[in-house]
């Protein structure tokens, strides 16, 4: 029997690894939700309703975490006792810092020129970069290189932020 304190992976009876069968996750989530959905406990007592609500909330949180590769990696690292240190560890490889500066300049230049096509191209580049880095992150996590994986997570978080900024610029220019 799974308890509320077990890992997200245990809740869905999945291996605690980065590579994840999304169809198996979806099926496991639906199975758990079928068992604990509050509607099934409409006629139950308050205590049972409260427990069902806790389980449903727990299942939703676990599903959202495991469904998102970056959240899944962060969670997996936390299970291994590794804090990614996103708030206080901003040290990154010099090459990545240079890439950050280039992306920022591209955003500024394209926004100043009101060039939506350039922003679209940058967004595509960021998506490709994210995809490649997620593959590398999976390799790092599966090989137990947790500190390198933590840095990769921080880099991916930055890439997501930049992509969000690009999206906001595109939206601003198109309105």
Curated annotation (Swiss-Prot):
Asked if the Swiss-Prot or TrEMBL record annotates the protein with the keyword Chaperone, the reply is yes
Family, per entry:
Belongs to the HscB family.
GO annotations of cellular component type: iron-sulfur cluster transfer complex
- A Pfam short name: HSCB_C
- What is an example of a GO molecular function annotated in this UniProt entry? protein-folding chaperone binding
Where the record annotates domain J, the positions are 7-79
Give the UniProt record's GO annotations in the biological process aspect. Answer: [2Fe-2S] cluster assembly; protein complex oligomerization; protein folding
User: InterPro entries recorded for this chain?
Assistant: DnaJ_domain, HscB, HscB_C_sf, HscB_oligo_C, J_dom_sf
Protein's UniProt name: Co-chaperone protein HscB homolog
Q: What does this protein do?
A: Co-chaperone involved in the maturation of iron-sulfur cluster-containing proteins. Seems to help targeting proteins to be folded toward HscA.
Q: Does the keyword Secreted feature in the UniProt annotation?
A: no
Q: Name the UniProt key words of this record, in alphabetical order.
A: Chaperone
Query: What is annotated about its quaternary structure and interactions?
Result: Interacts with HscA and stimulates its ATPase activity.
